[in-house]
Amino acid sequence: MKAIHFGAGNIGRGFIGKVLSDAGIKVTFADVNKTVVNALIARNEYDVNVVGADCVVEKVTNVTAVNSAGSEIVKLIAESDLVTTAVGPTVLNIIAKTIADAIELRLNSGNKFPLNIIACENMVRGTSQLKAQVFKYLPESLHVQSDQTIGFVDCAVDRIVPPAEAGETDPLAVTVETFSEWIVDQTQFKGEIPTIKGMECTDNLMAFVERKLFTLNTGHLITAYLGVLAGYETIKESIEDEAIRSDVTAAMQESGEVLIRRYGFDPQAHAAYIQKILGRFANPYLRDEVDRVGRQPIRKLSANDRLIKPLNGTLEYGLPNGHLIKGIAAAFLYKNDQDPQAVELQAMFAEKGLAATLAHYSGLAVDSETVKLVEQAYQSLK
């Protein structure tokens, strides 16, 4: 079995690419980083430092790479069995045309074997969003045929993979936590679902997408924003502050009540899931910087992301949300001159104030009681 994986960064190599290679799949990474691509071509392997209660180095083999902006990639995709991505939402739109060209080549050459595409991104139904972009480039005459043999499979992914340590000279060096979760929507595959250890199938994906979004992502981000305010550099330092840990735990409990109401998660099991995540945040072997976790605040304040979506769930079910509101307020105190979204958010905030800015990016009503509560929380955080 052959797979193309877009994104040879830390998540690509340390998570998805590793899972595929461990399953005996030949993986070709597609990326624009020539240093990483050339190293993968030269070595055909790399080491992953897996850290947790036990720290081990695991070798990933049977891999190579290709420039994702070159002409070769289209033919490689057309001849593959699986395409995965870990590139981020912005780049996902950029690679859509390449994937469309490959599907067109594949179908026009008479290849009727199934091809499944899985976007492993921090997005809700990211593969469905990718499909919408691909179909903009794919000739309309091929849409029906594509739907018969090309599967666009949504998933939920979870593994903390921080950037390489400063001073690291090996372009393929990567460190990951022990925990990983990759859950795919089994209803969207075309043909036989491949058996891949570390890839779990479900017919109720949204429950797991929102469990991860409302718990790991929500907790991670609020830890980062409160950590920045307290002067910490890392998630570990932040979550070891009892006041921050208390706020983050309470925020995850608030979002958890939404999940319990919506999907019927067992309350005790979900409480244990929250505790596991808090333990992951405190992993002493991961240098997970608050500036990295906090970046792109505009995207993270959007209606379907990790702050506003659980908040809207609490409003839907009439549940407490004070700690989620505190986390949203903290986003407006996040300043990072290296992050265009943080700069844009602060510029609009300075010009129009919190209520108008929050309403603009989140979809919340500017005159709502919720927005007023965020304003109050902001004042108490300043």
UniProtKB/Swiss-Prot annotation:
Recorded catalytic activity of this chain's protein: D-mannitol 1-phosphate + NAD(+) = beta-D-fructose 6-phosphate + NADH + H(+)
> Which residues does NAD(+) bind?
3-14
Which Gene3D superfamilies does the record match to this protein?
A: N-(1-d-carboxylethyl)-l-norvaline Dehydrogenase, domain 2, NAD(P)-binding Rossmann-like Domain
Any single Gene Ontology cellular-component annotation: cytosol
Q: Which UniProt keywords apply?
A: NAD, Oxidoreductase
Q: Which residues cross the membrane?
A: none
Q: Name one GO molecular function term.
A: mannitol-1-phosphate 5-dehydrogenase activity
Tell me which EC number(s) this protein carries.
1.1.1.17
Keyword Oxidoreductase in the entry? The reply is yes
Q: Which InterPro entries match?
A: 6-PGluconate_DH-like_C_sf (IPR008927), 6PGD_dom2 (IPR013328), Mannitol_1_phos_5_DH (IPR023028), Mannitol_DH (IPR000669), Mannitol_DH_C (IPR013118), Mannitol_DH_CS (IPR023027), Mannitol_DH_N (IPR013131), NAD(P)-bd_dom_sf (IPR036291)
Which Gene Ontology BP terms does the record give? mannitol catabolic process
Which major enzyme category is it? oxidoreductase
Q: Which family does it belong to?
A: Belongs to the mannitol dehydrogenase family.
The protein's name? Mannitol-1-phosphate 5-dehydrogenase
Organism of origin is Psychromonas ingrahamii (strain DSM 17664 / CCUG 51855 / 37)
Query: Which lineage ranks, top first, belong to the organism behind this chain?
Result: Bacteria, Pseudomonadati, Pseudomonadota, Gammaproteobacteria, Alteromonadales
**Gene this protein is translated from:** mtlD
